[in-house]
Amino acid sequence: GIVLCTARMNRIISCDEEEMSVLVQPGVTLMELNEYLAERGLRYTPDPGEKTATIGGNAATNAGGPNAFKCGSTRDNVLSVRAVLPSGEVVQLGCDVRKCNDGYNLMQLLLGSEGTLAVITELKLKLCPAVKAQMGFILPFDSLESCLSAAGRLANSGLSPETLEFMDDDMIAFSSS
């Protein structure tokens, strides 16, 4: 096997605030990207738990996090990628615009493939305005079934929560220790 480190491919190449997109190399960490975007009143919505994870790693695993309920996983927030195929060919996949309906979406196949199909060298990501205010709730449920039922009703209610996170007794005990 081959181990490839993209840690030095860590540049934020450009940010288009009007188009609400950012072009990054795969070694940029989620924390670095979020700090950069916060200064511009923007944010990248996928929010997996590990803030030192790289954007390339998030793309390779199609990471999501609690915000995936409303904002989607990494796959839903990548406009385009540049990648190197095993043959050495460099390909540009996806579109540089938010709506793109032409042909097969090979980029979607690449995202989540864990590096088995290509090496990602650049990603153009969708951005959103930074959140001005937030509110959180912790709701206890007697059973998994009642929790899932409430989540389904919430999803169909017309309300639009950005984050839903399920924690069972073991996870609560672990996070409390």
Task: Kindly label every feature range from the protein language model.
Residues 1-4:
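Glycine-rich loop at the start of a catalytic domain that most often binds anionic cofactors/ligands
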Residues 11-165:
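FAD-binding subdomain of flavoenzyme oxidoreductases
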Residues 162-177:
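Terminal amphipathic helices with adjacent charged low-complexity linkers/tails
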